């Protein structure tokens, strides 16, 4: 059964995708803009209902993820992707090491990102496949949402700055 998100706004420019963190299943869910006719497919709405101020999003994919734990939780709210980069990022938030790297990220809120596994600071984008991620056994993060490198690459290629993220 498809999951539908109905988004109401007077704004007329909507993004093709919407991201939602499902904390229960530890999944980052990806929704794609759908034709408004799906509203009538899933809900009993009167036939003369004007859906022009609504956007329908259908779930198309979900990605395994981990997110913030008790000591540093992931914020709850509705955000927009503020920026994105395919470049490496050096972080000092990992408790066991002074610095770690990840390769590519989407900025959601301040220092809260969607990014991939963490690597030792001597890894590069070209050599990271030769290294074991230092974060491979983690069950939570310092607040960011962490997905696989493959999924992150897909997000970087397809998600625009401004896309809604529900966390």
Regions found by a protein language model. Give the residues of each.
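Exported/periplasmic cell-wall-interacting domains
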Residues: 72, 85-167
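Intrinsically disordered, low-complexity
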Residues: 1-76, 167
